[in-house]
Amino acid sequence: SGSMALNRMQAAKGAAFSLLTEAYQSRDQISLIPFQGDAADVLVPPTRSIALTKKRLETMACGGGSPLAHALSMAARTGMNAQKSGDVGKVVVVCIGDGRANVPLDVSLGTAEPLEPGTKPDRQALKDELIDTAKQLGSIPGFSLLMLDTENKFVSTGLAKDIADAAQGRYFKLPKTNEAAIAELTQGAVGAMKA
C-alpha cells in the first residue's frame, strides 16, 4: 500500500518474506502486485521463483496513492488466469495494507482523468467501490482473501476488516512486535486458509 509509513512498510515486508518462505516450503506459486501511485501492477507474475520475488520485494518502494480496488481486481484476474492454465487450484490473495484507498478504479483503468492535485476523491464512493470489488473477489470459486492490516492508528478506521468481511476472507492485525511474531502470524494464517 502506498499509504503505509516507513516503519509499517518494514513490518509488511517482514510478513511478505515470511509468506515467501512458506510458499517455498509448500512449492506454491506466488505473485507480487504492489499498489501505489494511480494503479496496481503485476510486478511478479505467478512463479515458484522465490529469489526473483524476494529481489523485487526488497527494492519495492512505498508512498503515493493507494489504488486498492485496482490491486484486488488485478489479483483476481491474475489468479483466474493461473487457474485456467491448470497450474493452480486454490488461490489465496494476501493483501497487506491499511485498507485505505484513495485512487478510484476508473482512474486506475484509465477511463477517467486523475484527480487534480489537492483534490480528494469521495471517501464513501471509494469505500463502496472497494467493498464491491472485495465481494467479487470472494465470490470467485477457489479464491480466498487474507487481509493483513498495517493500520497504525490509535483509532482504527476498520476498513481492512470491512474488506476481509466483504470477501468472506480472514483478517489479522499485523503485530507491532518483532519479525518472529509477524512470521508466526502470517504462516499460521496462510496454513489455515490452505487447509
Task: Tell me what each language-model feature is.
Residues S1-P46, H70-M74, T78, G89-I96, ...:
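Von Willebrand factor
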Residues A5, Q29-T59, G79-K84, L105-L109, ...:
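Short beta-strand-loop
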Residues Q10, G14-T21, A51-E58, A69-R77, ...:
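Solvent-exposed alpha-helical segments within well-ordered globular domains of core cellular machineries
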Residues A61-G64:
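A glycine-rich helix N-cap at a beta->alpha junction
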Residues R77-K90, V103, V107-A195:
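Von Willebrand factor type A / integrin I
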Residues G99:
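Active-site metal-binding loops of divalent metal-dependent hydrolases
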